[in-house]
Amino acid sequence: CHSRGGPPGVWAVGGGGGHSVIQTFGSGVIEPGELQTTLGTGGILAAALDTAQENPKGRLQVFCNVAADKWHCMGVSLNAGSAMNWFRENFCHIADGQHLSFEQIVAKATASTAGAKGLLFLPYLYGERCPHADPKARGALIGLTARHDCGDVARSVMEGVVHALADMYSLMQPLGIEKHVIKASGGGAKSTLWRQIQADVFGCEVVTTDGAAEGAAFGAALVAGLAMGVWPDAQSAIKNFRAISREQPNLAVAEVYAQAHEMYRSLYPVLGQTLTALSSPIFDQ
């Protein structure tokens, strides 16, 4: 970054981090109790730590943060927006190669109910990375009946992605990571329904902030500002972030999602061996 107003020929070099670290910083997450979610092609759950933590099984990643004396912890799913795109391309045809728009699909999902009328979706369409490091993992719809329609399945896909994020959080809790607020980003954060599902499953407020839509690019701009002395530290850089949306947990559906999440968490341990067997080349002939 060239520092305008600085000595000629002097360049400021900003030390940042990988894509997720920068995106988390761009969402304003550096304090305890804050979680950051990214719903892009994959799904990310991230938080800041005051101290480095051991991660013996390697299912989470812990490394340096943008903020001084902070650490970054995250879990990454391979399936988020990619799962919705799979559903759209394969089951939402209209005519002449056209598909329902994502907005139309979400409208149908909104018309369904919390818990998708008793339908659960394991979103492991591309294998999985966290919380189950299993390249042979496969997706599944559990509880499908003749009464379920397009909107119910769409909602179960959206809920399954959020259940996967909440599954990651169960790995973070032993590290002392709390959840008071989620700061959402990524294309999926544009969906009011997807933000509300996060609030309901996690049981905490979900906000989006100005700049989060630009993701890592916005975070990189903040890092550049730090390098050029626009702000003295990371905390100062994010203190004026403005919330542009807020979703509160709906207590009326809290029990529905609590039970659904427990059922969701029970599925992979039971189905994992079968899903692995189904990845055998014999079924690809």
Label each PLM-derived region with a short phrase.
Residues 2-285:
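Active-site core segments that coordinate phosphate-bearing ligands/cofactors
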